[in-house]
Amino acid sequence: TYFVTSEHLLRAGLGGKLVGWLQSPIPRQKSGSAASTVLTMMRYLRRGMNVCVFPEGNRTWDGVTAEFLPSIGKLARSSGASLVTYKLTGGYFASPRWAGNSIRRGKMHGAAVRVYSPEELRAMSPQEINERIVSDLHEDAYERQRKNPVRFEGKALAEHLERLLFLCPKCGRMHTLQSRDDTVRCWKCGFSFRYLPTGFLVGEDIPFDNLRDWTRWQKGEIVRLCDEAEDKPIFTDTDVRVDTVASGSGTKLLGRGDMRLFRGALELPKAEIPVSEITGVSLMGPQDLYISAGDTHYVIRSSTVHCMVKYLTALSHLNGDVHYGE
């Protein structure tokens, strides 16, 4: 079985080289075109080989299965291969994306949901196939957790939640939330809450008891900030490193410093990208931000904790044509 994986994983030092050597995965460039990936998948499938693809292309931030490109249905129909839908549950709480390498002890489950023959796929439209895939794979981790709570034990359960949450719901300030052990506190107004082993949140006057609802509120606030920004920066993040990315040949340092997002431009160290020219934006892992502007690809990293996911919401709002991937 050949797995479709991010091209950037294959550049991740010795581990990336081992993955490439042992698995021969099909590379997919973050925030870039998927045309070459699709062609490789079709070639393997028509040779009778198995290909595994996660249609969302990303791990969820809020526990809800993300949307995927509508081309998945067309690919499944034209491949001439059978389609097996396989659903994983429990992974969101066992290894939260915002937590980095923190693993929690709990229950995960995986099982095949449906097998569609080539004949069944040919009898459906690409849209109907997509609807079946959504029906088979959709998951809301918090909805499941409310019905059947499972504990996911570990250390420092809340640490690095700042990678997801950057707005205090009490005072409204940005970048004032700080995590330690299982607690997050706003250093400006004193608001605080705890992250429980079940993934739920508890605290005095806390408006949300889960990260799904908090994230939905925060996305709405990001849209508001974009609309009200006028000529002022919407976000500013300090101490970042920007590299340009060349397909298959690594990265090259562009500059270090601060990044700022305006309604019309993304300012990076030694580069300014008009928002209208941004064609793709995505995240690798918890906070490596990938930006595509035509044939030029950038990766923005930092050794300190940042909430980079906010740029995905903002840029997809400011430029409706941008290809958006979490």
Language-model regions, residue ranges each:
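Broad, structure-driven detector of short, well-ordered beta-strand segments within folded domains
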Residues: 86-88, 176-178, 193-195, 257-263, ...
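A conserved mid-domain beta-alpha-beta active-site/ligand-binding segment of alpha/beta enzyme cores
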Residues: 116, 127-164
